[in-house]
UniProtKB/Swiss-Prot annotation:
The lineage of its organism: Eukaryota, Metazoa, Chordata, Craniata, Vertebrata. This is Vacuolar fusion protein MON1 homolog B. Keywords: Acetylation, Phosphoprotein. GO terms for biological process: protein targeting to vacuole; vesicle-mediated transport. The gene is MON1B. Belongs to the MON1/SAND family. InterPro entries: FUZ/MON1/HPS1_longin_1, FUZ/MON1/HPS1_longin_2, FUZ/MON1/HPS1_longin_3, Mon1. One of its GO terms (cellular component) is cytoplasm.
Length: 547
């Protein structure tokens, strides 16, 4: 993987011919604005940003009868702590009791609604079902009216508000936003919300439920999942890297230790085991995938991020759990069986995905082998120090300071390598430092997130995509750059000049090149599991028929 450290940054002289534009409703210093360069400093043409056809997953087998919709509500939900009651279907998702005329409700920057085609509410980010029933009725009527004319409603723009609609089978998802997110970015956020719902029930189960009863109240089966959806939407506001870049973030770790942990996962296998993941603080340590299961289908980063968010639920703070989970991008109609455990009272989490429903004890034995191996490697102590936990599970997620780069004037950045030689072996990843002053407060983090979203939308504009954007704002200077090797967003001090920004970015690229073995997983390990028992378990093989 090339980090782009040897790539020459654009020279200051070439920046004088930049086109001057300005973000809407954004104050800038005199002589500032946005400078966009639709040219590649390396002389390369712009790569296509459209989605490509992905390999088709193996043919799934339907979930066992015990996982039919009628019994799914009895499955333990990691989104709801065991010592707290789940919210009733009539309760508010966001804890805000108001309607569109309520000032507190109107003050929210973004609202997300999920409802059925019949107008039955499923999830609300803020407000109560009773107060917003009329609003959701209007949404359903709008969609039905446009569909009756043989068309599909995608978005509505009204002054500084956007309404984005997404129809996914029998579910209607709507985002109402006054943030700087583009319609495409809001649609991606709605897809992530839909994926979270599908991960609990599967797409086939949702379709079967509403085919049987159109006005079914799906909240009964999703009780407790509202908190997971809330956390997902909060992360977009304050830490947008994963969803914005379509990648996962790794824990910075010395390559020898990461390779040793990968080899440990490769050795500790069980029949039907498809994927092993070590994570801490919602970030990936390493992962190993079974050769036969995932050899022809790359694990999508959206699915992996969903798993990382899932195991970050408060209910996984201690002990172990066994529950079915669906990976929507891999196969939206089937279940894996997930074993989740915290290791040695540490925040390190082990996730084992298998295809056999009765494999809990085999997975638990595998966990003990992993735990013993990590102690032998001294990994527990190293991970605890890297995360800054000191056995305190309430501490923040593992990260590094932007000061480690050694580039004065650099406040924050998002970096995603794009030179991935083998998409079946390499996970899309990104790295970013911890948000520090002046972005310690929530409103400042939201403002930085808005700036990143604006830059991303300009770089990936379908009508006029850009290569380089230099933006001088009121409180910071930003530079966004995409090449064939990387995608980079940097936030700099407002006092940094154009020439100074180029020097900072050059130093940052050299640092990433030097540290890439520590920041990224170069080649996720693969392994072959022991053969599955030849008993009657073939009919209960979970997701796959050929194992």
């Amino acid at each position: 993987m090339e980090a782009g450290g040897d790539t020459a940054a654009p020279v200051p002289g070439g920046a004088e011919d930049l086109e001057d534009t300005q973000f809407p409703s954004e104050e800038t210093r005199e002589g500032g604005g946005v400078h966009a360069v639709p040219l590649d400093p390396e002389g390369e043409g712009l790569e296509e940003t459209g989605s490509k056809d992905k390999d088709q997953p193996p043919s799934p087998s339907p979930p066992p009868q015990s996982e039919a919709p009628s019994s799914t509500s009895r499955l333990w939900s990691p989104a709801a702590p065991e010592n707290s009651p789940t919210r009733s279907p009539e309760s508010s998702s966001g804890g805000q009791g108001g309607d569109p005329s309520d000032e507190e409700w109107r003050s929210q920057r973004k609202h997300v609604f999920v409802l059925s085609e019949a107008g039955k509410p499923i999830y609300l980010r803020y407000g109560s079902v009773e107060a917003l029933s009329a609003t959701m009725g209007v949404m359903t009527a709008l969609v039905s009216f446009v569909q009756s004319a043989g068309d599909t409603i995608r978005a509505i723009y009204a002054e500084d508000h956007k309404l984005v609609f997404l129809q996914q089978g029998p579910l209607l998802l709507v985002a109402m936003s006054r943030t700087s997110q583009s319609a495409a970015q809001l649609r991606g956020e709605l897809l992530a919300v839909h994926a979270q719902i599908v991960s609990t029930l599967t797409r086939a189960s949702v379709a079967r439920i509403f085919a049987h009863k159109q006005n079914y109240d799906l909240r009964r089966l999703l009780a407790g999942s509202e908190r997971t959806l809330d956390r997902l939407l909060d992360s977009v506001e304050q830490d947008p890297g994963a969803l914005l870049l379509g990648a996962v973030r790794c824990v910075p770790l010395a390559r020898p230790l990461r390779d040793a942990l990968g080899a440990l996962l490769r050795r500790c296998t069980a029949p039907g085991l498809a994927l092993s993941v070590l994570a801490v603080g919602g970030r990936l340590i390493t992962a190993a995938q079974e050769r036969n299961v995932l050899a022809e289908c790359r694990l999508d980063p959206a699915d992996l991020q969903l798993l990382l968010d899932w195991v970050g639920a408060p209910a996984f703070a201690a002990g172990e759990a066994w529950a079915p989970v669906c990976l929507p991008r891999f196969n939206p109609d089937g279940f894996f069986y997930a074993y989740v455990a915290r290791l040695d009272a540490m925040p390190v989490c082990l996730l084992l995905l298998g295809t056999q429903r009765e494999a809990f004890h085999a997975m638990a034995a595998c966990r003990r082998l992993v735990e013993d191996g990590m102690h032998a490697l001294g990994a527990m102590r190293v991970l605890g120090e890297a995360a800054g936990f000191s056995n305190a599970s309430s501490a923040s997620a593992p990260a590094y300071s932007v000061q480690a780069v050694g580039a004065p004037g650099l406040r924050h950045f998002l970096y995603k390598p794009l030179d991935i030689p083998d998409h079946h072996r390499q996970l899309p990843q990104f790295t970013s430092p911890e948000l520090e002053a002046p972005y310690s407060r929530e409103e400042e983090r939201q403002r930085l997130s808005d700036l990143y979203h604006r830059l991303h939308a300009r770089l990936h504009n379908t009508s006029r995509p850009l290569r380089l954007i230099y933006h001088v704002a009121e409180k910071e200077t930003l530079l966004a750059w995409v090449t064939s090797k990387f995608e980079l967003y940097t936030c700099l001090s407002p006092l940094v000049t154009k020439a100074g920004a180029i020097l900072v970015v050059t130093k940052l690229l050299r640092w990433v090149k030097k540290e890439e073995d520590r920041l990224f997983i170069r080649y996720p390990p693969k392994y072959s599991t022991p053969p599955a028992p030849s008993t009657d378990q073939a009919a209960h093989n979970g997701l796959f028929t050929g194992l």
